[in-house]
Amino acid sequence: MNKVITTAAVILCLAGAANAGDARTSHNRSTAMASSAHQILVGVDADFALPLSTYGDINGPGAGALLTIEYPVIEQVSLTARAGFQYHLDKSPVAGVDTHVHSIPVLLGAKYYVMQSDRQGLFAAAELGMFDLMTSATIGGASGSSNNVKFGVGAGVGYQWNQWNARVNIHSHDMGSFGDALMVTGGIGYQFAGF
């Protein structure tokens, strides 16, 4: 009877060790990218944008893409940089008038991984930076446009899984008119390289 119990215990230990080895190899790439200290992670985010408040009166829904860079500084905190372009559909606040505000965000920030130590799971993010706001209006046959560079801030939450992430953000594209330039974005991202 002792031989059976001993054999069963050895088999269970070996099976557990083999299973742990399989779990490590199945996430080999994500662990290598996520746990490397001071490694720059490069990716791309695609998002859908919905303007709020009075910003929604002159700007339609939009979509965009951003190049992302993440630099881990300590176990749960990374510095981030994101830059890209956001295209918005026309909005007609008055009959015969079409307006939109495209933007080029250049943002610096930080990302805090809440529950995990290997840069996986729930995270919170905060960003600040410049928004190049390209406003265009068409009235009848006449059109006009202007560019304004504004300072803005944002915050968001998301979830990181291997190289993929999903996040929801709220940004103010203009700190001078904080409540009048709010934008909610949601999207997915993929980290494709690490240096």
Where do the protein language model's features map onto the residues?
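Gram-negative bacterial Sec-dependent N-terminal signal peptides
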Residues: 1-19
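Flexible, solvent-exposed loop segments that connect beta-strands
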Residues: 27, 48-58, 84-103, 132-149, ...
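Residues that define the transmembrane beta-barrel architecture of outer-membrane proteins
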Residues: 38-40, 59-63, 100-106, 120, ...
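Residue-level detector of the transmembrane beta-barrel scaffold of outer-membrane proteins
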Residues: 41-45, 78-82, 121-125, 165-167, ...
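Predominantly the C-terminal beta-signal and adjacent terminal strand-loop region
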Residues: 82-94, 153-195
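Surface-exposed, polar helix/loop patches in the mature regions of secreted/periplasmic/lumenal proteins
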Residues: 111-145
